[in-house]
């Protein structure tokens, strides 16, 4: 919110420096971002009256004789398309400073002497977005009464001081000049004095011309007024100055009035051209899926049922609370204006403006709240201004649908409650003084008092809110310093926090270093290593194209980190990250993504470097898999690894899917050589594990089992198998043999070569058996081995050696 200090002083008698005011407002609850003076850095800019203006042949230039209050006319060469005889302009005389500290000097253009420069507002440093459209491509024309030689600062209010406020959602009442004036008045114990307009209505009734219908519960109130015989023209300079200093571009007197009322009251308004209506009934309703509307910015908007529209004859003419429609836009030929003042559901407006990426001054106020008490007053004020500035005739009455509560909100508390919370010894008289400054009525006594909170302060509803107001206005610096009183509370980690700690212990114990990568990446990298890619959630306004989409995997960002290090000769890396990925199964423009906690690590280079005793040991698949196994041993969870050949960007022969109770929870393996080449990194192994799924398993109750006092028995078995048979196949065959007393399977030897037929290999296992309730006999163990042997022969075609 940009607050003009000149304008503020019209509403409340305050005569302090802006620095002092900013400090005071910040300490009482409204943060001040800063104070700027538009004229800062500018000098020697005066009013000039163009006495004559001649075109320079074969150029776009004009040779002007300008009266700048000196004894002689000043010759200035100007190339602006709208320069002409008889107008008042901004002249930078030699020695003047304009935007970017540029100094104006005497010079020659096409051989013609130029004793200064006729300036546009852009050349004074004003933003393109706030310059009136009529002057956006040329010089600024000053009012007819401007006196040649006078400083231009007062004519354009460039000598004003602009206070930028950072308004939090709970203080949306300060999104208006009246709201800020109330706040400043309370701080300094002053009274506000707001301008009142004398509205003169015609005998003709507005209700005879139009009617209003509300067909959505998202519309709390809708009011309309008709002003006829208006003359659309540029606004007077004082109004344009106020709008520009508030960051709003002047358009014409009708539109500018609605924006002025928006700034004054915080009440969004809209003006329709009544003659462009194809009907007389204004309907506030939900849009229909697939309905379209071209808004004032010329963009065609695709609407959905959650959007609110204003319709006439079943055709949308405005996107309610956000932006008007082009079909009923006020133009230079408009004669009859329909003014709108409404209250729409803030949540609905926020969703619509967010979905369409269409933020406006109106939408921001509807999102944060509207003062119900001044909706009707703002409408009448706008109509009266159109009488003054556009010569309009106001038809009698507002056409209104919906009733708004306007009575004050009663909040009761006690003096004891206030003093206990603040640690003070305030009296009832002190409390009365505070609420008198705020403009709140108060009644009662020290035992109990009731405060009537006006509707302009919709953030106050409970006792604690009253305490906050008392503390703000009384002064935080006056509150006594006391030690906090609080009993000890037992803290506890969440299950996910505990899981993160255990994962971090294993990772760092394995020699991994923690890193944090960006959650935003490119759309391509967002899904590159995803096992089940979902819809991509993209930002509407990304800072860079490389950070435009929420990631669905952590691996791609981790590989960027590895590439960065490898490029700087740091080639032996072992890193991990515990972070979130974002899965989107719905519509990214409407639904929030699901956040999934993951554990990811990456390994590249050497595990052990070469020395005089040992060879260098590079990272391999089994080293990475071993870290995963160590993690699940720590977590006391049984997982299985299944060869995976179809995972994008991963090596088809060195990648495994990780299964927990048959459910896929991640993968481990080598990055595909082609992908590694794209990242410009050497052979790299990665793993990504879904911690959110593991968390649910961690919460299962553990069943205690007695430690058996009976010894275990081990038997070794050597198998001759085809090379295609995997360790997993063998373990599966053993486990499904139906032997209940089998407690452990350990592979201790693999051999292929001499004395083994080509295409075959030898694998030796140690099998452990144990009966928790009795000693195992040799006969029992022999039967178990027979079952296992039979299963191996039948299921993997093994030959017992």
Swiss-Prot record:
The reaction(s) this protein catalyses: tRNA(Phe) + L-phenylalanine + ATP = L-phenylalanyl-tRNA(Phe) + AMP + diphosphate + H(+)
Keyword Cell cycle: no
Domain FDX-ACB: start-end pairs: 708-801
Enzyme class, broadest EC rank: ligase
Biological process according to GO: phenylalanyl-tRNA aminoacylation
Cofactor comment text: Binds 2 magnesium ions per tetramer.
Gene Ontology CC annotation, any one: phenylalanine-tRNA ligase complex
Keywords: Aminoacyl-tRNA synthetase, ATP-binding, Cytoplasm, Ligase, Magnesium, Metal-binding, Nucleotide-binding, Protein biosynthesis, RNA-binding, tRNA-binding
Recorded GO MF terms: ATP binding; catalytic activity, acting on a protein; magnesium ion binding; phenylalanine-tRNA ligase activity; transferase activity; tRNA binding
Residues in tRNA-binding domain copies: 39-153
Classification via NCBIfam families: pheT_bact (TIGR00472), YtpR (NF045760)
Protein name: Phenylalanine--tRNA ligase beta subunit
Species the sequence originates in: Streptococcus agalactiae serotype III (strain NEM316)
Top-level taxonomy: Bacteria, Bacillati, Bacillota, Bacilli, Lactobacillales
